[in-house]
Structures are given as structure tokens and as C-alpha cells.
Amino acid sequence: MTHSEYRDEYCGAVTESLIEQTISVVGWVHRRRDHGGVIFLDMRDRAGILQVVVDPDTPEAFAIADAVRPEYVIKITGRVRQRYAGTENANMTSGHIELLAKEIEVLAKSETPPFPLNDEKSTVSEDLRLKYRYLDMRRPQMQDRMVFRAKATSAIRRYLDDHGFLDVETPILTRATPEGARDYLVPSRTRPGNFFALPQSPQLFKQLLMVAGFDRYYQIAKCFRDEDLRADRQPEFTQVDIETSFLNEEEIMNINEGLIKHVFKTMMDVEFEQFPRMTYAEAMRDYASDKPDLRIPLKLIDVADLMKDVDFKVFAGPANDPKGRVAALRIPGGASLSRKQIDAYTKFVSIYGARGLAYIKVNDASNINNGVDKESGLQSPIIKNMTDDVLVSLIERTGAESNDIIFFGADKASVVNDAIGALRQKIGLDLEMTTCEWAPLWVTDFPMFEETEDGRWTSMHHPFTKPKGSVEELKTNPESALSIAYDMVLNGTEVGGGSLRINTLEMQTAVFEALGIDDQEAEDKFGFLLDALKFGAPPHGGLAFGLDRLIMLMVGASSIRDVIAFPKTKTAECPLTQAPAEVNTKQLRELGIRVREKVQADTSKSAE
């Protein structure tokens, strides 16, 4: 209930149903205006804004209203009335009514905030916003996002509860296990020289819960990774962690697809059709990404076979390299791109390791069947290195038409995929080529392993992912092994990923062997899991959604920092609390830790 000693209703919830009633509201002064001897106060709370009118007929209230300033906390008692015709505000829930003040009480005064809270267009540095995050979160946009997140999380819980899942907490203090990023370590006071690790995910514990017989588990879990930050990464983040037993890949995907459909319908009244499916190989071939944005109708076309014999080493080299790739990206209407725009895209792909960006402008493709007019039909510095047959085949394969442009990537396949995949996304957004607002997708059949630069195998997901095929097939051809893994992609962002897990000791040992993990190392790091696999582990699998990332997409924020109450900066620091910080010598001594003077000196120097 809203009613309390202080208020009868939230400011943003006062509606026409309360007209002629006397009510009390509390909140912050969002804006104060003085018009012709009448004072208007915009009162703000988490539910929205209410316009309050204070006139001289109530002299005591008027005097207080004259003295209040933005961000004062006040209580107002008054009569709800209809706004005068022409003064309504359709953008506010309370936009057809106002509160005529009778009594005003100042509950707390406020200094002038370090940045305006009533101007969403104000440009304020993120560091300043995070330093005063408790003020930043008063802004209506931030209030709306935090409320949205809370309600979306509640919708997730309801769906999983209704589908028989149990909310089980797993430990925060655990042991270090390699999962692809650095662990945050916590020294043990009772066992000097030993350390806990904060979990990068509840992966092993949720698998143990399956062994324990809790066949449907979920948790809104805090996870920690000490890694370099990007727009969609934080050192501590929240994931919706899910695990099931006795369900196959398709059944797990259907449950989780249903979850996302439920959340979008509940929160945004958006209804999705069945999510399309695409294999990893198809995604990399057509989109050069394992998380393609299907809102953008552009595809890469492999043209290496056409370039093997051209007199252009930039193309011929990768075309004849088993690890190379030559791919074309046709942009309909792209011939209108200026030299300046093309130069900007060339600079963009260099970020991803590309050494240039070749292109052909198709000014006129009308007579392509009669040969290529290199004078007026095509425009590019590279066409002089190609025969007419190659150019005709190139135009036909890409489907290029008049006024198109074709961009090329030619290098190691990994470089082409990174550079041209990113270029596809950027051009699609720059030229407003998106065909829909939301494009969900499942990507399946990932490789089990990927090769490192030094020739070793590493898990593409994690070492507990179940491969397709038998133990013998895995041992014989690890390079071609596929995993029973699946990622959920939304608008080019991976929002969730999961797999079936290994539930036999024989297969888990074979995977460890492929990864170069010997018996002793496996026992030291994962002995408790290997023991559990000896006692009847059921077939199981699951998935985890990045809650921060999902909410970021749903509310249209540019960073997950905008949907987390108290996030860290890009350098994993908290401007509000000044964390991380030094601790006193007594605390360090109790933990058996001594900070080297050189480290302290380096830290002091870098802070100057």
C-alpha cells in the first residue's frame, strides 16, 4: 500500500480518479517556476512527476514554496483538481490534473547539486555521475531504468517459479578455477597463504546441484571477472543462471526462449515468433560473427576461388592460404558513399587488424552480360588487376546492381571476420538499413575447441561442455569436434549462452586430455566434480543470461553501467566509495600479507 504517515499516493500515480480529494504527497522538488504571482512546483518521486500549484491565498504555504529550491524534500497536502484546458501535459501520467497546495512542510533541505537533475539533455561526465550516483539515480530516466530492471527480474522469477524451477543460492567464496578470465582472489585469515576466489559463474555448483537431484535450478547470481572492461562488461555483473536435468538441447532452448518471450511481452508488450536457428558455421560464413545482427540484411559472400590467379597479391595471397579468407560485402546504393566516408570506414576496419579496405563501385551494371565497362561501369583502383571474366563473375555472385558498392576483406580468416563483420554492422546502422526493431536468434553447433597461437587447444565455451559424438571420435578428431552448445543473440548482442554438460567421467577425462590437462592438474582443480561424476550424474544442461546486458538492450541504454545501480568505471573503480583502496597494516598483517614498497611507489606515481 502507498498510504503512510507521510503520503497517500505516489506523485506519479495521482490521476483523475482522485479529483476533488485532499491528499498528501512527498518527494523532491524537480523544478520551481514563478508565473504571475503563482508558484508552480514539479514534485518528483520514483513513480513520476506531479504539478503542484501554490497561490497567495495560502500565505504560509506560499512563503515556504517561495523559499524552496530544487532537490528539497517536501511534503505537500492539497486538493486534486482538473488542469485548465490547454495546460494539460500528455507526456505525464498526471498530466491532466494538478495539486492545489494547502500545506507545505520541508522535510530536508538540499545544497545545489553538482549537475542538473531536471535536464536529461545536460552533458555531464560519467565520472561525475558515478561519484554522485545517489543523485544521478534521482533523474527520471535512471529511476525508470531501475524500476524496469526490478520488474523484469520479478517477471523472470515468476516464469521460472511457474515452470518448476527452484531458486538455490551457491557460494560466493569458492576456489579458483580457470574459466577464461582472471579471478578476484580473497585471502584466507584462518589459512595463511591460501585464497578464496569470487565466482566467475556458478557453473560447477549448479552441475553439482543436478547430481544432488535438484533437476530444475535457477539463481539471480552475482559473478566476478577481473578482465579489461568494455561497454558491456563489468568486474561484477548479474546473470540469470539456469540448469536442468533430463532435458535435451531442444527442450532447454524452448524453455529459455519462452522466458525471453515472457519478459518482452510482460515488460514491453512485444511478441516474438519462434526464434530462427543458425549454426556457428553458417553465422561465420554469412555474417563473419557468431552473434550476427539479423536486423541488417547484409551478407558476406566468399570469393576466394575467383581470386586465386588474379594479379593482385593482396587478394591472391589469402585466396591460396588454407587459413585465409577473401570475402565481399555488397552495400545496395552504396556507390553514393563519398571518398571521405570510405576513408573513415578504412580507418574503422584497421582497428580490427585489417591493412586496408578494397572496394568496387558499381556505377552501371546494365550491360554486365556483354562484358565489363571499366571506364564507366565500375570504379575502383583494383579493377585493373582483374580480368573481365573475374569481374563479371564477381558482379554475378554478389548480385551487385547499379549504384552499389562492394567492399572486400582479404587476410587471415580471423582478421577478415573481425573487420568485415564489424564493418557490416557499422554500415548497416550508419545507413539505417535495419528492417525490424528486434531480431532474436539461436546460434548452435559451436566448435568444441579453438586453437591458440601456440598451437594448443582451448575450450570455445568451457571444459564441461558436452561434445557431439563418442569419446573415440573426440580423441581421433578433436579439431572437427562440435559441441552441444547454444547462444541466444539479440540485435547482434549475445544475451545468453549454454550447453549440455558432460555427465560421465570417461568423457570429461577425454576433454581434459584434449585440452592438455593431465590427471594431476584435473584432480587438483576439479577433483570434487570428478568425484561427483562417479556417483550417478544425470544428463543435464543449462544456460545463463546476462541480466545487465538484456536490460540494457530492452531500455535502449548504450552501456550496462546505465542499468546498474552502483557500477564500476571502465578501470574497475568506484568513484563514489573510492574503491579499491589501501587497507591498514594491521588488516594486512592478520592476513599474512605484506605490500612491497615498489608496488606502493608505482601506485603513488601513477596516481600523481
Swiss-Prot record:
<feature type="region of interest" description="Aspartate">
    <location>
        <begin position="203"/>
        <end position="206"/>
    </location>
</feature>
<dbReference type="InterPro" id="IPR029351">
    <property type="entry name" value="GAD_dom"/>
</dbReference>
<keyword id="KW-0067">ATP-binding</keyword>
<dbReference type="InterPro" id="IPR004365">
    <property type="entry name" value="NA-bd_OB_tRNA"/>
</dbReference>
<dbReference type="InterPro" id="IPR004115">
    <property type="entry name" value="GAD-like_sf"/>
</dbReference>
<feature type="binding site">
    <location>
        <position position="461"/>
    </location>
    <ligand>
        <name>L-aspartate</name>
    </ligand>
</feature>
<dbReference type="InterPro" id="IPR004364">
    <property type="entry name" value="Aa-tRNA-synt_II"/>
</dbReference>
<feature type="binding site">
    <location>
        <position position="225"/>
    </location>
    <ligand>
        <name>L-aspartate</name>
    </ligand>
</feature>
<dbReference type="GO" id="GO:0006422">
    <property type="term" value="P:aspartyl-tRNA aminoacylation"/>
</dbReference>
<feature type="binding site">
    <location>
        <position position="501"/>
    </location>
    <ligand>
        <name>L-aspartate</name>
    </ligand>
</feature>
<feature type="binding site">
    <location>
        <begin position="546"/>
        <end position="549"/>
    </location>
    <ligand>
        <name>ATP</name>
    </ligand>
</feature>
<dbReference type="InterPro" id="IPR006195">
    <property type="entry name" value="aa-tRNA-synth_II"/>
</dbReference>
<dbReference type="Pfam" id="PF01336">
    <property type="entry name" value="tRNA_anti-codon"/>
</dbReference>
<feature type="binding site">
    <location>
        <position position="179"/>
    </location>
    <ligand>
        <name>L-aspartate</name>
    </ligand>
</feature>
<dbReference type="InterPro" id="IPR004524">
    <property type="entry name" value="Asp-tRNA-ligase_1"/>
</dbReference>
<keyword id="KW-0547">Nucleotide-binding</keyword>
<protein>
    <recommendedName>
        <fullName>Aspartate--tRNA(Asp/Asn) ligase</fullName>
        <ecNumber>6.1.1.23</ecNumber>
    </recommendedName>
</protein>
<comment type="function">
    <text>Aspartyl-tRNA synthetase with relaxed tRNA specificity since it is able to aspartylate not only its cognate tRNA(Asp) but also tRNA(Asn). Reaction proceeds in two steps: L-aspartate is first activated by ATP to form Asp-AMP and then transferred to the acceptor end of tRNA(Asp/Asn).</text>
</comment>
<dbReference type="GO" id="GO:0004815">
    <property type="term" value="F:aspartate-tRNA ligase activity"/>
</dbReference>
<dbReference type="Pfam" id="PF00152">
    <property type="entry name" value="tRNA-synt_2"/>
</dbReference>
<feature type="binding site">
    <location>
        <position position="234"/>
    </location>
    <ligand>
        <name>ATP</name>
    </ligand>
</feature>
<dbReference type="GO" id="GO:0005524">
    <property type="term" value="F:ATP binding"/>
</dbReference>
<keyword id="KW-0963">Cytoplasm</keyword>
<dbReference type="InterPro" id="IPR047089">
    <property type="entry name" value="Asp-tRNA-ligase_1_N"/>
</dbReference>
<dbReference type="Pfam" id="PF02938">
    <property type="entry name" value="GAD"/>
</dbReference>
<feature type="binding site">
    <location>
        <begin position="225"/>
        <end position="227"/>
    </location>
    <ligand>
        <name>ATP</name>
    </ligand>
</feature>
<dbReference type="InterPro" id="IPR045864">
    <property type="entry name" value="aa-tRNA-synth_II/BPL/LPL"/>
</dbReference>
<feature type="site" description="Important for tRNA non-discrimination">
    <location>
        <position position="35"/>
    </location>
</feature>
<dbReference type="InterPro" id="IPR002312">
    <property type="entry name" value="Asp/Asn-tRNA-synth_IIb"/>
</dbReference>
<keyword id="KW-0030">Aminoacyl-tRNA synthetase</keyword>
<keyword id="KW-0436">Ligase</keyword>
<comment type="similarity">
    <text>Belongs to the class-II aminoacyl-tRNA synthetase family. Type 1 subfamily.</text>
</comment>
<dbReference type="GO" id="GO:0050560">
    <property type="term" value="F:aspartate-tRNA(Asn) ligase activity"/>
</dbReference>
<feature type="site" description="Important for tRNA non-discrimination">
    <location>
        <position position="86"/>
    </location>
</feature>
<feature type="binding site">
    <location>
        <position position="494"/>
    </location>
    <ligand>
        <name>ATP</name>
    </ligand>
</feature>
<comment type="subunit">
    <text>Homodimer.</text>
</comment>
<dbReference type="InterPro" id="IPR047090">
    <property type="entry name" value="AspRS_core"/>
</dbReference>
<dbReference type="GO" id="GO:0003676">
    <property type="term" value="F:nucleic acid binding"/>
</dbReference>
<keyword id="KW-0648">Protein biosynthesis</keyword>
<dbReference type="InterPro" id="IPR012340">
    <property type="entry name" value="NA-bd_OB-fold"/>
</dbReference>
<dbReference type="GO" id="GO:0005737">
    <property type="term" value="C:cytoplasm"/>
</dbReference>
